[in-house]
Structure formats: structure tokens, C-alpha cells
């Protein structure tokens, strides 16, 4: 026998099991920025989503603001990749450059910055590799350095999506030590679609 009345006993219980209402002010828009100029490149795995060069991203951000979406999650696509993902923590990297521009042109937009090395490494993994083994502990300082550089550029929230153990603690400690005690951390689940960009 189906007894749904069990789920209607209290206001809290009803609130927890009722239908969801998605509103634009609760959405976060993904923004993929790439190096280069005058680029708007569709992402095949995500219809309606494009990669933008910094000089063209405001076209999309104007649409985001018009829709009253209050936040973006920014992903970088660098031209240069190397074994240690140095583009991720380069103070003049693509994400850092884009964040500074966004905060200048759209100061009220909440900027969430994805932290992972996979897009910046020549091997495509989110950690350093030696002899075919991912070096977890050696990767943590690079992730922390990336997070601090994003915060320094103006990111409101740091969103680690890598798969290194103890990354959140390492990032939090580095942010605090650099004076970014009020910069928040938000977990983002790695998505095969994000990784296909």
C-alpha cells in the first residue's frame, strides 16, 4: 500500500519532498574562455555553448546579465600546455586575464573559477605524473597556487574539480595564508562534457 501521507507530516518534511522550482537567480552559467582574438567557437558536446576569446566574451556576458543569471563558472582553455600545467597558475593566464576583465566590466557578477590542471597539462590529467603514476601530494601546491592566483585576479569563489586527495584543505590553507579568508570554496563535480571542451 502506498502511504504518501508519511511525507506530509510536518512543514519541514513537506518542504524537503515537494517539487523543485528553478529560478534564474539560482543558476550558474558556464563560461569557457580561450586564448586568441575574435573567437566564438561552438562546443560540439554542449549545444548552445561556445568558447570565447576574452575580447568577445562580453557579448555572452551581456546575454547572461540580460537573463538575470547572477553567477558564472569560468573554465580556461590555454594555447600552451606542459607537463606541470603552468598556464593554470600563471598570473597572466587566460582565466586570470578573463576574471580581471569580468570584474572590471561586470562588478556585480559572481565569478566562480574552476580549479583543475587537466586542461593545462600536456597529458590531460589533473595531477603531475611520474613513471605513469599521478603524484597526489606534489600536485597540491600547484592547485593551491592556481586558486590563489584566481582569487588575486578577483574570483569570488574557487571551485576545485580535480581529483586529488586533500586538495580542499591545501587550497583553503593557501587562500587564508595569502589573505583571502573570505574567498569561498565550492565543489564542482567533474563532468565528461566539461572535459570534452
Enumerate the predicted regions with their spans:
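Conserved, mostly hydrophobic/aromatic
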Residues: 31, 57, 114, 150, ...
Amino acid at each position: 500500500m502506498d502511504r504518501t501521507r508519511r511525507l506530509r507530516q510536518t512543514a519541514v518534511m513537506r518542504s524537503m519532498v515537494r517539487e523543485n522550482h528553478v529560478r534564474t537567480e539560482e543558476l550558474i552559467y558556464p563560461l569557457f574562455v580561450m586564448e586568441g582574438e575574435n573567437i566564438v567557437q561552438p562546443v560540439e558536446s554542449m549545444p548552445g555553448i561556445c568558447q570565447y576569446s576574452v575580447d568577445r566574451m562580453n557579448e555572452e556576458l551581456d546575454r547572461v546579465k540580460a537573463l538575470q543569471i547572477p553567477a558564472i563558472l569560468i573554465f580556461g582553455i590555454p594555447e600552451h600546455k606542459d607537463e606541470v600545467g603552468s598556464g593554470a597558475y600563471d598570473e597572466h593566464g587566460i582565466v586570470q586575464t578573463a576574471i580581471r576583465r569580468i570584474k572590471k566590466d561586470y562588478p556585480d557578477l559572481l565569478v566562480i573559477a574552476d580549479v583543475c590542471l587537466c586542461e593545462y597539462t600536456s597529458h590531460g590529467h589533473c595531477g603531475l605524473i611520474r613513471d605513469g603514476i599521478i603524484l597526489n601530494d606534489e600536485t597540491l601546491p600547484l592547485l593551491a597556487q592556481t586558486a590563489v592566483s584566481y582569487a588575486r585576479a578577483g574570483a569570488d569563489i574557487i571551485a576545485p574539480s580535480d581529483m586529488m586527495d586533500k586538495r580542499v584543505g591545501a587550497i583553503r590553507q593557501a587562500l587564508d595564508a595569502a589573505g583571502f579568508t573570505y574567498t569561498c570554496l565550492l565543489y564542482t563535480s567533474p563532468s565528461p562534457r566539461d572535459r570534452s571542451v
